[in-house]
Amino acid sequence: MVTDKQIAIVTGAASGIGRAMTLGLLDAGVDVAAVDRNETGLAAMAATVHDKMGTMQTIPADLSQQSSFDTIVSAVLSRFGKIDVLVNNAGIGQASIKPDQRRNPIRFWEITPDQWQRFLTVNATGPIMMARAVVPHMLRVGKGRVITVTTSLGTMVREGYLLYGASKAAAEAAMAVLAADLRGTGITSNVLVPGGVTNTAIVGDDAGDRARMLQPEIMVPPLLWLVSDAAAGITARRFVAMDWDASLPGAQAAEKAGVPIAWLGIARMPVEPAT
């Protein structure tokens, strides 16, 4: 459980996984700064949260713009005075380019330089720059949580998924570096993924029966554990939401659903030269 009033930033909060995580945090009593470029979507969500235990601040922002990061942090600090949790969720999928991209994959030679740059900017640079803006404020108090939504390993290397897969892989590798850089500071960096095709706008029109997909709310139980006191020492891990067993105590569920971040469990680290 959360034992004191926490302040969280959730990016990409107006729909899909971001919306589900925002509502889950609010239900748990966490105050949330909901960030999204979709101002209409933020307003619609804000109209539905009056009965929640937490309060919500809406911040319309485009994370492809470098000026957005400090603006977001300043707005949150002005409203709440601190930041305890950053949830990097904002992202774009290949269905934004080709709605039938599962049936007709986007081959790497078909992508444009502008498309490549946009996916890197939103899916990889955005989480890094958001953390860069937030973490100094966490360092001052010696605690904080950075939680980043990436994607399944299979998606990272899937045929026709260079734009999405590689940009999400870059984000996860970056979060592994964050975990290493932040070791001993009281600030953790972990990755959370659904574990399968999820009913969001990221997937295209040809993804199949949405009722049979994972639903965004699957992310809430592991997220709430990650922001709880019980997860204070947990860092450099990747948690798969579909493997989270909510019937188990949190630590056991985390052990079952977690693996080392960024494939560290399946690759041998290089031997460093002696110093």
PLM regions: where:
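A short, exposed helix-loop element centered on a Lys and neighboring polar residues
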Residues: A131-R132, A176
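Conserved mid-core segment of classical short-chain dehydrogenase/reductases
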Residues: D70, G93-Q117, R140, G160-L163
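Conserved glycine-rich Rossmann-like NAD(P)H-binding loop of the short-chain dehydrogenase/reductase
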Residues: V30-M45
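The beta1-alpha1 cofactor-binding region of Rossmann-like NAD(H)/NADP(H)-dependent oxidoreductases
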Residues: E39-T40, P60-T71, P113
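Catalytic loop of short-chain dehydrogenase/reductase
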Residues: R107-Q115, R145-A170, M175-A176, A180-G184, ...
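C-terminal helical subdomain
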Residues: G184, V191-L192, G208-T275
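Canonical Rossmann dinucleotide-binding motif of NAD(H)/NADP(H)-dependent dehydrogenases/reductases
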Residues: V2-A33
